[in-house]
Amino acid sequence: MNEKVVMVSNGYERIDGRNAYKSGIKRLTLGAPMLEENKKMQIAAQIWKNDKDGELILAQELPIHQILELMIFLSRTLLYFKDAYRLPLLYDPEKPLVERVGLQGDVLPIEVCVDNQNINEDIKAFAQSLNDLGELIGERKRVLNRILEELELY
């Protein structure tokens, strides 16, 4: 299990958001990919849970570039919802595109999912959930911001 793991964070269940102290996620790791589908990447993040016998098992794995892209996606979404209240439906049905983020010679399009038949209700619930999670999100954004600022110094 520890083969090719370089960085580890044990005890994740203590800080897992609203699941803190009740989470099934026990450990986060960074190292060489373990899943065949990720072998082309050099580094991946792994999420570990206990199986029914209490042994740690790999629950999820993502290459680090996908984690960064999820952070870009989430960050842009958070920025979008800061001003979405100005739109009656929280989005413009005629212009669902939020931003096209340039990456790797192409783009990561970020848009409201107008294919969702219940988007008008779901986007309101999503916005309310972001508001309800404000304290959890805010704390993590502050920590992430501090670390990103430190990275800029290198």
What are these model-derived regions, one by one?
Residues 1-38, 53:
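N-terminal "first-domain core" detector
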Residues 53, 57-65, 106, 110-113:
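Short, solvent-exposed segments of well-ordered alpha helices
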Residues 153-154:
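C-terminal non-catalytic accessory extensions
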